[in-house]
Amino acid sequence: MKRSSGILMAVSSLPSPYGIGTLGKAAYDFADFLKDAGQSYWQMLPLGPTSYGDSPYQSFSAYAGNPYYIDPDILAADGLLTAAECAAPDWGSDPRHVDYGKIYESRFTLLRKAYKRGWERDAEAIAAFAQDNARWLPDYALYMACKRHFGMKAWTEWPDDDLRLRKNEAVLDKYRTLLREDVQFFTYLQFLFFRQWTALRDYVHQQGIRIIGDLPIYVAMDSADVWAEPQFFQLDDDLVPKAVAGVPPDYFTADGQLWGNPLYDWDAMRDDGFGWWIRRIDGAGKLYDVIRIDHFRGFANYWAVPYGQPTAKNGRWIAGPGMDLIERLNGWFPQLEFIAEDLGYPTPEVAQLLRESGWPGMKVLEFAFDSRDSSGYLPHAYTPHCICYTGTHDNSPLALWRQEAAPEDVAHAVEYLALTEQEGFHWGIIRGGMSSVAELFVAQMQDYLGLGEGNRMNIPGTQGGNWTWRLLPGELSDALSVRIDRMTALYGRKA
């Protein structure tokens, strides 16, 4: 990875008249902005369909795209919708934040109109798309149709045990026939998503921009992935988890974090040649140029919490697949680059695995200025083979961090980076990352805009109000792109 820089910006955060960012004009405009600003990378959050809590890290599928991101204007230009139909629903009144409730109420109703007009018209192209994605699409479409049939209940709560347990092909065929219309509908939504995504990705590449995508290490229990292939997870005979994922107690959380995701049966995966992971990375490789593996430490060892425990306190560490998996992925995907999200308290096992993997790890500037202890996140401690971030989606924007952090930590940052009010606090922190030896520097869009309270993407461990932040129309000014471009060139990162 050559010396370069990029911007972290979720698709959901793009401006749009339809309540949430889409793969339409604003996405193309953002690619233009990145080019004008001298950037080389657009880092995104996961693109999958969101479920309870609206988190892109808890998706119904490791392969599918989020139907919310299908752009209505593109569908209208293609004759699948009318402008009046696109404008009719109430998409929410706050342009700064997504109202997921209103999106859920109206989006699928609108998209079903497009399906009614396009299913037969696009039959040949749909058939080709379905053939190319035969490994996951039929299970996903049936899973979503069944969820809708059973009132959006998790598959673990479906009343038909034969279907829940996938007893035989006959029961699956029964529901494919019973729910044929919905199976076709959810198939068509994926066809539309990937058609729009491919066009956008090609345009982004034409601008000289590469895409970094986030890959959550775990999949959601309520997902087509677990329902379709339960043999690769630590489940009992009734498909109830034996243990679930989380992290142990630490300085910040006395009870640890109980994520609740099912854990992988690494022995079963190893016996299968890690085929499940090869298929998953192959799917991600159709979306992204670089893949950031979230919670990389889970490949070294993972925290297993007995199912039913109210907190993560009573878990234990279990060895992960280590280099057996990583060597397999590196061998299968030489064209892809990986980033290891190795944040948290380092252990010798994780550090060794990172070195052996050859993947760059992460440095976060907001973690650098702890006045109580010397930090490996300070830029002078970097080696080039790393990725420097101002913060991730789980961090406050810099302007908000300045308000929340201990005064001594802010003072440490001011002294270390010679920050001044004339330059601007957030610009000085960005300068610290830009000037570092890290191969790649990435800043949140909120940080370039100097946004503070009310503009955080996610607060880990909380429910409600997360994943809603949006860019306002007009905030990507020419003056901003010029300033970013100048700093990018000054520190030798310009594309």
PLM features per residue range, with description:
Residues 10, 54-194, 219-442, 446-453, ...:
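Alpha-amylase-like alpha-glycosidases and glucanotransferases acting on alpha-linked glucans and related
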Residues 474-495:
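Terminal-tail/helix-coil boundary detector
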Residues 35, 197-205, 330, 354-355:
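Surface-exposed amphipathic alpha-helices with a cationic face
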Residues 25-32, 195-203, 277-279, 425-429:
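Short alpha-helical segments and helix-capping/turn motifs at coil-helix boundaries
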Residues 1-82:
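Trp/Phe/Arg-rich N-terminal binding region typifying the photolyase-homology
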Residues 42-46, 204, 210-216, 284-298:
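Short acidic catalytic loops
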Residues 186-219:
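Conserved, well-ordered alpha-helix/loop/beta-strand core segments that scaffold catalytic motifs
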